[in-house]
Amino acid sequence: SSGPCCDRCRCTKSEPPQCQCQDVRLNSCHSACEACVCSHSMPGLCSCLDITHFCHEPCKSSGDDED
Protein backbone atom coordinates (compact mmCIF):
# COMPACT_ATOMS: atom_id res chain seq x y z
CA SER A 1 0.00 0.00 0.00
CA SER A 2 1.27 3.45 -0.83
CA GLY A 3 1.98 5.74 2.09
CA PRO A 4 1.02 9.40 2.28
CA CYS A 5 2.81 11.65 -0.18
CA CYS A 6 2.70 15.26 -1.29
CA ASP A 7 4.26 17.05 -4.28
CA ARG A 8 3.39 20.63 -3.34
CA CYS A 9 4.02 21.26 0.35
CA ARG A 10 4.30 24.73 1.89
CA CYS A 11 5.76 25.41 5.33
CA THR A 12 5.99 28.52 7.49
CA LYS A 13 9.37 29.62 8.82
CA SER A 14 8.21 29.24 12.41
CA GLU A 15 9.61 26.69 14.87
CA PRO A 16 8.23 24.14 14.59
CA PRO A 17 7.18 24.80 10.98
CA GLN A 18 3.52 24.59 10.04
CA CYS A 19 3.23 22.70 6.79
CA GLN A 20 0.27 22.09 4.51
CA CYS A 21 0.02 19.93 1.42
CA GLN A 22 -1.38 21.89 -1.52
CA ASP A 23 -1.83 18.95 -3.88
CA VAL A 24 -5.26 18.57 -5.49
CA ARG A 25 -6.32 14.98 -6.04
CA LEU A 26 -9.29 13.31 -7.69
CA ASN A 27 -11.89 11.90 -5.28
CA SER A 28 -9.60 11.41 -2.27
CA CYS A 29 -6.74 12.79 -0.19
CA HIS A 30 -3.50 11.07 0.81
CA SER A 31 -3.80 8.19 3.27
CA ALA A 32 -2.70 10.16 6.35
CA CYS A 33 -5.04 13.11 5.78
CA GLU A 34 -7.58 13.78 8.54
CA ALA A 35 -9.25 16.93 7.15
CA CYS A 36 -10.01 16.17 3.50
CA VAL A 37 -12.28 18.55 1.58
CA CYS A 38 -13.62 17.74 -1.88
CA SER A 39 -15.52 19.81 -4.42
CA HIS A 40 -18.96 18.68 -5.55
CA SER A 41 -17.84 18.31 -9.16
CA MET A 42 -17.42 14.95 -10.89
CA PRO A 43 -14.77 13.83 -10.34
CA GLY A 44 -14.32 15.59 -7.02
CA LEU A 45 -11.23 17.73 -6.57
CA CYS A 46 -9.91 17.07 -3.08
CA SER A 47 -7.34 18.83 -0.93
CA CYS A 48 -6.05 18.12 2.55
CA LEU A 49 -6.41 20.88 5.14
CA ASP A 50 -4.20 19.23 7.76
CA ILE A 51 -1.45 21.36 9.30
CA THR A 52 1.61 19.27 10.16
CA HIS A 53 5.17 19.96 11.31
CA PHE A 54 6.68 18.22 8.26
CA CYS A 55 6.11 17.42 4.61
CA HIS A 56 5.35 13.93 3.34
CA GLU A 57 7.55 12.32 0.71
CA PRO A 58 6.95 13.54 -2.86
CA CYS A 59 4.46 11.43 -4.81
CA LYS A 60 6.30 11.55 -8.12
CA SER A 61 8.88 8.83 -8.57
CA SER A 62 12.46 10.04 -8.42
CA GLY A 63 13.32 8.38 -11.74
CA ASP A 64 12.14 9.93 -15.00
CA ASP A 65 10.19 7.00 -16.40
CA GLU A 66 7.49 8.90 -18.28
CA ASP A 67 8.78 8.11 -21.78
Swiss-Prot record:
Keywords: Disulfide bond, Protease inhibitor, Serine protease inhibitor
Gene3D superfamilies membership: Cysteine Protease (Bromelain) Inhibitor, subunit H
Matching InterPro entries: Bowman-Birk_prot_inh, Prot_inh_BBI
UniProt site positions, description: Reactive bond for trypsin: K13, S14, H40, S41
Tissues in which the protein is found: Seed.
CDD domains in alphabetical order: BBI (cd00023)
Disulphide bond pairs: C5-C59, C6-C21, C9-C55, C11-C19, C29-C36, C33-C48, C38-C46
Molecular function GO terms recorded: serine-type endopeptidase inhibitor activity
A GO term from the CC aspect: extracellular region
Protein's job: Inhibits trypsin but not chymotrypsin. The inhibitor consists of 2 domains and has 2 sites of interaction with trypsin.
Assigned protein family: Belongs to the Bowman-Birk serine protease inhibitor family.
Subunit and partners: Monomer. Although dimerization may occur in solution.
Protein name: Bowman-Birk type proteinase inhibitor 1
Organism name: Dioclea glabra
